UniProtKB/Swiss-Prot annotation:
Gene3D superfamilies, per database record: 2.30.30.790
Keywords: Ribonucleoprotein, Ribosomal protein
Species for this entry: Campylobacter concisus (strain 13826)
Sequence similarity: Belongs to the bacterial ribosomal protein bL19 family.
A molecular function GO annotation: structural constituent of ribosome
Domain of life: Bacteria
Physiological role: This protein is located at the 30S-50S ribosomal subunit interface and may play a role in the structure and function of the aminoacyl-tRNA binding site.
Protein name: Large ribosomal subunit protein bL19
PANTHER family cross-referenced by the UniProt entry: LARGE RIBOSOMAL SUBUNIT PROTEIN BL19M, RIBOSOMAL PROTEIN L19
Keyword set includes Ribosomal protein: yes
Amino acid sequence: MRNKYIEAFENAQIAGKNIPDFRAGDTLRVATRIHEGDKTRIQNFEGICIARRGSGTGETFIIRKIGANSVGVERIFPIFSDSIEEIKVLRKGRVRRAKLFYLRELRGKAAKIRELRK
């Protein structure tokens, strides 16, 4: 049984955020707030969502992009993090899995995900 105070706090955290509906295979742009000394700036990270896990305030998602020199870069973001300014869905992907970890081994066009038709 969960503590009612913790549950009330988590519900307040969830209600305050506007999270778009996305799943594995979607291309996302995540804008994060970065603090460097006394300055603050926004950094965008754009890539394919390869997994979502957890529930409630502990829910996370993994974004993978191909960086410079064809090096794969992955970042794990907590969905309800205060440092996330915005999550924007750029494309809806058509996949048949909830976890796309197999994309780590694929290169080039083989790693492309088809776009979901409407």
